[in-house]
Swiss-Prot record:
Residues that span the membrane, as ranges: 25-45, 65-85, 102-122, 144-164, 203-223
Gene field: tupB
Protein name: Tungstate uptake system permease protein TupB
Organism: Peptoclostridium acidaminophilum
Topology versus the membrane: Multi-pass membrane protein
Functional summary from the UniProt entry: Part of an ABC transporter complex involved in tungstate uptake. Probably responsible for the translocation of the substrate across the membrane.
Length: 228
């Protein structure tokens, strides 16, 4: 038990002293996950609302496929992106493998179905009434989508925050496409996995505490929005 207590003490020292290595990892993690979430949300929210309020022949099949994609393992997404960005892959000429850009691409593809599914479910259940009111006022399809975004902005923000929590907590995809390179592609989750295998518990605990605080902050935001 002593080494655990020592690990926590050393972890707090690393955080309080603003250790450059720790905070480089933290900032990169937040940047990659935030960018990936923003890209996924920008595409999935309008698309999810459009699909939710529209009636088309294969809507039931679309729902089943979408909800299945929401649970795709992160390592599968990472593998697909790595193959696509490898030297012999179709996008190999871009030389993006083992860069933060590759990590953003992988995370965006990973969380896109989640944000799309949450938005689709929300708009399917609550968007019809808003659509009816909008059409009564003479709004077109695009105007209806904008109206739904405005009326359901709190719920949509919760969806985005949930998507971000999925992005920042995953390890498989970023490990594969990023390579966990020190000072370049090393993020919180990949660092914790590596440090644990090396027996460097103080640094692992420090990063674990940061990830835990981010998780608590996300849950606090979601709870406060749901209470409003």
């Amino acid at each position: 038990m002593e080494y655990i207590a020592e690990g926590f003490r050393a972890a707090m020292e690393l955080l309080v002293s603003f250790d450059p290595q720790v905070y480089t990892i933290i900032f990169l993690s937040v940047f990659v996950s935030s960018t990936a979430t923003a890209i996924a949300a920008a595409v999935s929210i309008p698309l999810g609302i459009f699909a939710g309020i529209s009636n088309f022949r294969l809507k039931r099949l679309f729902s089943k496929v979408l909800y299945s994609l929401m649970s795709v393992p992160s390592v599968i997404v990472g593998l697909v992106v790595a193959i696509g960005l490898s030297r012999r892959g179709p996008l190999g000429f871009m030389q993006l493998l083992y860069t933060p850009t590759a990590m953003i691409i992988a995370q965006a593809l990973l969380v896109f179905p989640l944000c799309l599914g949450l938005t689709y479910s929300l708009s399917k259940n609550r968007g019809s009434e808003i659509e009816r009111i909008g059409k009564t006022l003479g709004a077109g399809k695009l105007q209806v989508i904008i109206l739904i975004i405005r009326e359901l902005k709190a719920e949509l923000f919760i969806n985005v925050v949930t998507t971000f929590s999925r992005a920042i907590s995953e390890v498989g995809a970023v490990m594969i496409v990023g390579g966990n390179i020190k000072g370049h592609t090393r993020v919180i989750t990949t660092s914790i996995a590596m440090l644990n295998s090396m027996g460097d518990y103080p640094m692992a605990i420090a990063l674990g505490l940061v990830l835990l605080m981010i998780s608590f902050a996300i849950n606090a935001v979601i709870y406060s929005l749901q209470e409003e």
